[in-house]
Amino acid sequence: MNIIFLKVPSIFKKLNVGNIKILNVNQNSPSIIVNSNNTKSIKNHNYSSFTNNNNNNNKNQVNLVQNKSILSSSSSYKGNNNNNNKLSYTTSSNNNNNNKIEEIVKSTTVSPFTPLNILHPKLVGEKLYSNDNEANNNQKEFKAEISTLPNGIRVVSKQTHEGVCAIGLYINAGTKYESPQDRGVFNLLEKMTFKETKNNSTSEIIKELEEISMNAMASSSREMINVSLEVLRKDLEFVLSILSDQIKSPTYSEEELREQIEVCIRNYEMITNSSSDQLMTEILMGVAFGDAGLGNLVIATPEQYQNITREKLFDALRKYYVGKNIVISVTGAEHSQVIELVDKYFGDIPFTQKDTPSEDSIDSTITYKGGTDACVAGLIHKNHLKSQLQFLIEKQQKLKQQQQQQQPQPQNSNIDDNDNEEELLNLEIEQTKISIEQLELQQVKESSWIIAFPHSGLSTVAENKDIINGLVLQSLLGGGSSYSTGGPGKGMQSRLNLNVVYSSHRVKNCHAFLFVFNKVSLFGISLTTQSGFLQDGIELVLQELLMLRSSMTQQELERAKRSQKSQILQNLEMRSVQCDDMARHILSFGSYKSPEQICKLIDSVTLDDIKKLISKLAQSNPSVVSIVANENEPILTAEQYNQIVKQNSSTLFK
């Protein structure tokens, strides 16, 4: 005789013992008849199986009781009177009897809800999902398709199974193309996206996008400007018509231009009033490439923004927004449809202009320099505020001179505009003085240091796999911060995280990075520590960087390759990233490498490849930037680094 214990389901918690006869019991559709004063029927509630088939296929008779023992000559059970959540029952074979179950029930409570194992009546006939693995595996695998229009516009698209498509307009233009006279023009062109055109007002454009768009954004960088949207497939043509209108019929009204210039200036002040990663990156690019090309800052100075006019915007638009510089990328649509629509709305754009520079001509002027730059945190912003204060004071003096030279106004004249301007100037001067005082009282508690080395550009992907090796090395070094939510897949077992971040609570952040550009990239390590610990943190970083070549293992390499592949594949699951990825490939080297091809290249990376890359990077002239909390904070310069490497080259790179 078998004794089995069952946890009482919540639906039975209010049931008392009574007589229940369960007739026609089977595993598929049990029918339960409740005999009590308030008789109720329960059908198809298969909370548990009440039948056990033994080897003789005999039917069982089951007797259930609560808080009582069922004794037989062959078994015994001690009930627990305090345990109200268990049922005990015994089973015995009887070839002559059918299944019978008896209980004593005083009152019954039946759930009004449909059981979870039964399809809701309103969903009957609806196919919610498919478990047919074979059907899922037989779905057509879509590949990226590339075409070029007669005017040079390149179109890349990839069909998907989604009902949403991502659309991106990418222009081969950015701050690397700017001259000293038009610094900030491409940043302002980005800010003027979705603004008034000859055909629509700004409010109309925004309203239309709000009604159809899931996501809309514009961004600019050193080598590219892009506008991207996510919409339902049915709205693809409408979005392309909006994008076409933006680059063929803008008005760039003076009022909107002034507004966006103020936005850019506020962004500049926000970035320079910190020791943020973006500020470090901007300074680093200037150290690495000088004051032109890739060395041009993505954010211009307030004075440079103030010099931008409508004419400069139109000139940049005419010169760079040409067919050979444009790539249109779409996911979630048929390629033939995309080609037809792009030709309809963009087919009249000229291939080029006489004064349009080629990317090769710009890249030929880019040379890596290297060196060192250091400053005290907040000093850049403080200097900007002081120069702004001086400018306002000079403007105030000129205004007073103008007022003295003016003739007296009649008593019944309107309020003099100069009086209002003077009041605004006085207010702005006082606010600037307060900002300078607050900045001087501000105590910075962290110092940052960054070192970077020249690396192969994206245009070399067809020739070698240096970029792929750099991605794997980045994952191998990894990094992290002193505060982390944890969890797998975050590189917590990487070198920099284990041996630098975890070495001291005074290390706030340390990570490896790879800034990829067309001709030349930058590979490096960034470090942030508490004030007074920067020198110790730099020693930890150099120890990991210079000793990595001789100490890394095959296991670390395989983990880094898996991590890099998972990051790439996970990011490409987002339609916007996939759209962006295809366009960047076309802009950089004219073709598209699928995720499968990239993963195969990552798998082919060997220990020797990484060792050669480390030797090449470590022995090149670095670019070093430090933003320290105070002037007495010791730092490491590029010259000092080169001296350390030279003295230890025989042991480090043998």
From Swiss-Prot:
Protein name (database record): Mitochondrial-processing peptidase subunit alpha-1
Localization per Swiss-Prot or TrEMBL: Mitochondrion matrix
A single Gene Ontology CC term: mitochondrial processing peptidase complex
Source species: Dictyostelium discoideum (Social amoeba)
Principal location class: mitochondrion
Subunit comment: Heterodimer of alpha and beta subunits, forming the mitochondrial processing protease (MPP) in which subunit alpha is involved in substrate recognition and binding and subunit beta is the catalytic subunit.
Region named Disordered: 73-94
Keywords in alphabetical order: Coiled coil, Mitochondrion, Transit peptide
Similarity annotation: Belongs to the peptidase M16 family.
Highest taxon, organism lineage: Eukaryota
Any GO BP annotation: protein processing involved in protein targeting to mitochondrion
Primary gene name: mppA1
Matches recorded under Pfam families: Peptidase_M16, Peptidase_M16_C
InterPro entries, A to Z: Metalloenz_LuxS/M16, MPP/UQCRC_Complex, Pept_M16_N, Peptidase_M16_C
Residue runs in coiled coils: 381-446
